[in-house]
A protein has these predicted regions:
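N-terminal alpha-helical interaction modules that lie
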Residues: 1-121, 129, 135, 142-156
Length: 156
């Protein structure tokens, strides 16, 4: 399942109280299997992330950057918007690093206490992926800049 599909399936299941795994699986089979699941966003963060999913599918760097800026207009703490701007608008590694660091800060604000509570397992949590992509982008960029020790610390 793609990340947008997983996101929309998660939205579909939000607030549901299943009495068993079998009941949950039956719900998923009925509502998701073989279907394109689309659930309207519950707030500005989800709306911005939906714009980011469109940007990730776009082939034009100009369109991707435009959609990233649109996502930031909707929700200024959209970490993936900064990640896309680092990829598409940064003219050098220094500028890319600034975008990734803005993404890290934005993602940390979104995650709040969850950032510390789930440290070490964040890649496994769907809502932490934009933050983790910003962290990975920062580390890769530092490595490319020859700042190896900083890059290693950023990875861990």
């Amino acid at each position: 399942m793609t990340e947008p599909g997983l996101d929309h399936t998660s939205r579909l299941m939000a607030g549901k109280k299943f009495s068993s795994a079998e009941e949950m699986n039956a719900f998923l089979r009925e509502n998701c299997v073989g279907k394109h699941v689309t659930v309207p966003p519950a707030g500005p963060l989800q709306a911005a992330q939906d714009v980011i999913y469109r940007a990730m599918d776009a082939h034009s760097p100009r369109v991707r950057a435009h959609l990233a800026r649109k996502a930031l207009d909707i929700f200024p703490d959209c970490a993936d918007a900064y990640n896309l701007l680092a990829e598409e608008e940064a003219e050098d590694d220094g500028e890319a690093l600034e975008f990734y660091r803005k993404g890290i800060e934005a993602g940390a604000r979104v995650l709040g206490a969850e950032l510390e509570e789930r440290r070490g397992e964040l890649w496994g949590h769907f809502n932490a992926r934009p933050y983790m992509r910003a962290r990975a982008g920062e580390a890769h960029t530092l490595w490319d800049m020859g700042r190896r020790e900083e890059a290693e610390r950023a990875y861990y």
